[in-house]
Amino acid sequence: MKKIIIAIDSFKGCLTSAEAGKAAEKGIKSINPSCHTSVIPIADGGEGLLDVLITATKGKYITLSAHGPLMKMTKTHYGLSGNGRTAIIEMAAISGLPLVPIEQRNPMLTTTFGTGELIKDASNKGCRNFIIGIGGSATNDAGLGMLQALGFRFLDKSGHTLGTGGQIMEAVANIDTSGIHPALRETHFMVACDVANPFYGPDGAAYIFAQQKGADSNMVQRLDEGMQSLAEVIKKTTGKDITNYPGAGAAGGMGGGLLAFFNAELKPGTELLLKAIDFSEKIKGADLIITGEGKADRQTAMGKVPYGILKEAQKEHIPVIVLAGSIENLPELNKAGFKGIFSIAPGPITLEKAMEPEFAKENITRLVSQLYSVITSFG
């Protein structure tokens, strides 16, 4: 084998994508030090998106302070691509659920204001292209906080400016866009979104996601009704009906907020990232691709990282094998087109032991060395 591509998703809570990839590469090199291997860090639209794109574009991190979900100043960061033209933002880095103590989680109060501040900072630096991952949010404010940070004003029926949080949605009667940050009118947003939920309703933002952000049943109902009302005001203001747009309900309606007021596209995270790092070009001429993730199951064949890689590989007729900490629904995975799915576990072990980073690395290295020996023995 002349060229092997290694693109393994993070084993969440255990190994980063790069760590897993390097462990696999070590297994190959232990058998054939001269084999041409290429480790490509990879991610979906959530955890790891920023790090992967910074690495792929030879970009840099920008550190700053912005308002967290409860409007407390928080140190955070975003990324600039190597050419300085594209900003890469993980919404969770400033508006994420882990930033709110469990006892204070309340999507009536939490806001996306800080995400807007990151967008504004990058825009002031000349960025006119944005890649935004909107997973892991603590919010259900339809992106109104983000918009407020960018110069929008939301007014009640008496003309008073409203505050922040999901609680304001039900009171919005008019939207003043006159103070919008001027550069945003010529800015393009590519949004990594891995859910297709509509803006409101039984499958919408509030009913599906608000409870995990701290909402009780009464809050869920109020938030959903607020989003219904807000959708009408948005339609009146912009002419856009975002109600049933797939992904409009993502991140507490953040998807809808971006679609309503900006030149924004919502894309599955894996698809967006593979395109951004020019994955299709990187794999040309490869003899094998090794991918993987912490748990391979039926969701793997429904758009997760290994499946996205498989689709690209099939265009070039490159075989793909999957490494995973655990495996479920093996027949479905084989049917999807993977040439093999292998567990890195050496035998019966506790989850705690399996999640030890050094142990996981050793298991990946051991498995890949054995697989490489078998594959190459057939010429």
Kindly give the residue locations of the regions a language model identified:
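N-terminal loops that bind phosphate or other acidic moieties
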Residues: 2-134, 138-379
